[in-house]
Amino acid sequence: KTYPYINVTVGEAFPRIMLVRSMKKDKAKYFGPYTSSQSVRDIIDLSQKIYKIRSCNRSLPKETGNYRPCLYYHMGQCQAPCQGYISQEEYHENVRQMLHFLGGNFEPVIQMLTDKMYAASEKMDFEKAASYRDLLNSVKQIDQKQKITSSEMDDKDVIAFARDKDEAVVQVFFVRHGRLIGR
């Protein structure tokens, strides 16, 4: 097995997000490599819940309206571009925000989820507030896992090298906005 990557198919009319094991020369954006495939799945699940990015393999917009909306639409985790329920411009704005999030910029998401949680609780919609709280905790958990100690908030690629007389090892770390996002 090889290390997992997050693939966002930005070359498609309605991009998808998925876990892949290798990078290809295509129009997709890749994040990684990551050491834990479970972490990648958690990040993908969280991204789909927050930004409602599709996970189906339908060829859009060619197949728009040919099928019923999937279960993810009914669970509120997809905006059903397969049915034309969201415009391509709105969908691309969600993808742009998700790419920002995947790049390590968590603050706007934390603020948005906090605001929605408080608004839902003021409307006495405690189930919705609890779901926003859970999403908020997931984002904070990912944020904490990716903290590094650097006073500079620059983007860096760090290469570490160690050897002894028989072996050598090289490790590459990707730092974005002062956070370790991959290695």
Which residues are covered by each model-predicted region?
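Acidic, glycine-enriched active-site microenvironments
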Residues: K1-R183
